[in-house]
Amino acid sequence: MPSHKSFMIKKKLGKKMRQNRPIPHWIRLRTDNTIRYNAKRRHWRRTKLGF
């Protein structure tokens, strides 16, 4: 990835960075909760973004 990024690429990278985090702990504590972890976590070396 070049150091001079276009704004659109930078915006997409920022969104993917925000998506790639664990779920908040208080969500796990809610009643009738089935979500245990973020199924869409992405590792930077295993799965590439494709742009």
Swiss-Prot record:
One matching Pfam family: Ribosomal_L39
Example of a GO biological process term: translation
UniProt-annotated stretches for the region Disordered: 1-21
Keywords: Ribonucleoprotein, Ribosomal protein
A GO molecular function held by the record: mRNA binding
Superkingdom classification of source: Eukaryota
GO CC term (a single one): vacuole
Official protein name in the record: Large ribosomal subunit protein eL39z/eL39x
Gene symbol of the encoding locus: RPL39A
